[in-house]
């Protein structure tokens, strides 16, 4: 019996595609909203903007003498904070051929991606300034970033300490009597998992009408602060070394002065190593850290940040030492961060200037900058996370 099936008329059997293309998962930019100090009476355009702060007089506690004219006192000079302006931007060049051949309309997608890149990029730049504040406490009993381990997690005492310091510094709260906290979800997990009466307790919903409109992502108020949970809060593999993973042999050699070598994709280090971990072995530079990991078939390729000192031969035994990821939780009051803008960032549709009008530019551009304005209104808590390695 002969069937007229999909094999018989295979030319009519095609793969179908969904023309709706999803975007990558995104976190919501939020740091620019913290920059609430901006120029009020800027004198002129310039490459930088200087803010000035008066200093108060010392308290006059001595009594006056009835017949003696008190001595005048001179006011101290103002303190200044400078914000250096810089150009920021990015661009894409879409070809006419892509527009004609694409199964999905790319123009709206490119516009959306460019717009998000604008907000995302500037938020990273602003956070890089904010997270460098001079006031910092470390999880557990640690005294530096490099000594923090995964067990040095955040606790309520850390928050009480920082809120007390902010109030002692006379920092102005950001919402009612509450300070702002930017916290990573993996740090928030540890805080809310604290057990007993000292743990995450008596929290209030961020919908409390008396607090006004708080930040998107607010998860509650606690210990004198309101918490904004966001995965974009900075973390880095710059804590203490952890226990080394099981060693394994190289299967794809790396050249001298090269930056790569390969191991079996089934090896422990192939499945558990992360970018930022240390890696060592004959021919690998002593300070090498992993910058990229890619797997293709049975081989996992490691890229390191320092060139190999010699050939990394096949069968060379390598060791990966995981480095603790340290999370930065930021607490601040008003005027912790200043922002100055010469041109507000925005999307730019560039002119089509090629001879055949095939190349269509779209990008974003802005001229602005940030600086910490009141250090006394800014604190940072550096901790590990109990779930960072999961």
State what each model feature region is.
Residues 216-243, 323-328, 340-346, 360:
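Long, compositionally biased low-complexity segments
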Residues 321-354, 385-388:
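Hydrophobic alpha-helical bundle architecture
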Residues 51, 77-139, 171-187, 354-367:
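Long, contiguous amphipathic alpha-helices that act as assembly "spine/axial" helices in icosahedral shell
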Residues 5, 346-390:
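Extended, compositionally biased alpha-helical segments that mediate assembly or anchoring
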Residues 59-62, 102, 190-193, 200, ...:
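Short helix/loop capping segments that flank catalytic or ligand/cofactor-binding pockets
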Residues 1-84, 378, 382:
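N-terminal "assembly arms/tails" that initiate or stabilize quaternary assembly
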Residues 136-223:
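Extended, solvent-exposed, turn-rich assembly/linker loops in the middle of proteins
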Residues 204, 232, 238-273, 280-330:
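Small/polar beta-strand repeat architecture
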């Amino acid at each position: 019996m002969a069937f007229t099936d999909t094999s018989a008329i295979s030319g009519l059997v095609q793969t179908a595609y969904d023309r709706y293309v999803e975007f990558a998962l995104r976190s919501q930019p939020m740091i620019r909203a913290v920059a609430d100090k901006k120029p009020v009476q800027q004198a002129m355009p310039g490459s930088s903007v200087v803010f000035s702060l008066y200093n108060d007089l010392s308290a006059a506690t001595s009594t006056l003498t009835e017949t003696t004219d008190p001595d005048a006192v001179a006011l101290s000079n103002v303190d200044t904070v400078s914000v250096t302006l810089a150009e920021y931007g990015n661009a894409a060049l879409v070809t006419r051929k892509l527009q004609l051949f694409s199964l999905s309309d790319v123009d709206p997608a490119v516009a959306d991606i460019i717009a998000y890149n604008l907000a995302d990029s500037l938020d990273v730049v602003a956070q890089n300034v904010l997270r460098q504040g001079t006031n910092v406490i470390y999880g557990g009993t640690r005294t530096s970033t490099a000594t923090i381990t995964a067990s040095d997690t955040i606790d309520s005492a850390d928050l009480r300490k920082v809120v007390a310091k902010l109030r002692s510094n006379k920092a102005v709260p950001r919402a009612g009597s509450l300070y702002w906290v930017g916290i990573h979800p993996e740090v928030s997990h540890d805080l809310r998992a604290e057990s007993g009466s000292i743990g995450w307790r008596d929290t209030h919903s961020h919908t409390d009408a008396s607090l006004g409109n708080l930040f998107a992502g607010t998860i509650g108020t606690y210990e004198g602060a309101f918490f904004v949970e966001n995965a974009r809060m900075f973390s880095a593999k710059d804590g203490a070394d952890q226990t080394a993973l099981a060693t394994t042999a190289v299967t794809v050699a790396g050249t001298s002065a090269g930056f790569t070598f390969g191991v079996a994709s089934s090896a422990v280090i192939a499945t558990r190593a992360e970018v930022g971990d240390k890696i060592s072995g004959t021919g690998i530079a002593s300070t090498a850290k992993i910058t990229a990991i890619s797997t293709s078939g049975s081989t996992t390729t490691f890229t390191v940040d320092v060139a190999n000192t010699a050939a990394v031969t096949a069968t060379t035994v390598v060791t990966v030492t995981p480095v603790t990821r340290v999370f930065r939780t930021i607490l601040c009051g008003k005027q912790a961060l200043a922002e100055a803008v010469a041109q507000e960032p925005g999307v730019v549709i560039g002119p089509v200037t090629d001879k055949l009008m095939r190349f269509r530019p779209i990008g974003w551009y802005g001229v602005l900058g940030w600086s910490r304005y009141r250090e006394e209104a800014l604190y940072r808590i550096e901790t590990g996370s109990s779930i960072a390695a999961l």
